[in-house]
Amino acid sequence: MKAKRLFVVAALICATSANAQNVKETFDSNSLDWNECATEGHGGKSIIDKGVLTITSEGANKFWSAMAGTQIGENTCFTCSCYAPLNVQRPFKISTNVTIGKLDNDRLVGLLFNYKDDGNFYAFIFNDEEVNFIRFKDMKFVGSKSQSVKWSKTRKAQQNWRLESDGSTLSFFVDELPIMKVRYMPLEYAGFGYYTFGKQKLIVDDVEFVQ
């Protein structure tokens, strides 16, 4: 009887392992077919080379800003996205190692997710003082949540970001520091990527999808 119980336990462990999914993108190639998008009138680029993804957004130039009546860098964003190998209806984790540039009110970085297309997505974005959860639907800004950030130590340029979903709560971590949680925001799409705002440079070493 004891041997039979051990066999059942071992079978359950194997079944659990078989159901788990772990995919790591190391940017040795464009295996997940990453795509880029910039706000109209603003430039940027994303390049996969030498095992990293480098995303550069140019922000707004002085001439365009003057014509639009905005501050330099205002209302500019650049994204790079793929379709993650995940079922977003189930719990998952996404972990990524990045190097970020200078942050300011008009220089932000973050994670893009629940991405359907350029006008329908969620994002966690932050600077040195504040983190925001933003939502776009049909090219319109439809909601946000903001809160201040208190870094436990001096913020590093090299960081680990982690996005977790348990089915009802979305949690965003920077270097194990939980900087924002939101609840009851249903996920429909597996699109995932990176969000830069203003004049910014983001280098991505790798990203791991766990389910």
Locations of regions flagged by a protein language model:
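Secretory/extracellular carbohydrate-interaction modules
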Residues: G59-F136
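Short, aromatic/His-centered strand-loop micro-motif at the edge of beta-sheets
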Residues: D138-N160
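Sec-dependent N-terminal signal peptides
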Residues: R5-C14
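Short strand-turn-strand beta-turns centered on an Asx-Gly dipeptide
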Residues: F173-L177
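Short tryptophan-centered beta-strand motifs in secreted/extracellular beta-sheet-rich domains
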Residues: F27, I94-T96, T154-D166, L170-F172
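Flexible glycan-contacting loops in extracellular carbohydrate-active proteins
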Residues: V182-D205
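Extracellular beta-strand elements of beta-rich domains used
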Residues: F27, D205-F209
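Extracellular carbohydrate-recognition regions
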Residues: A20-G41
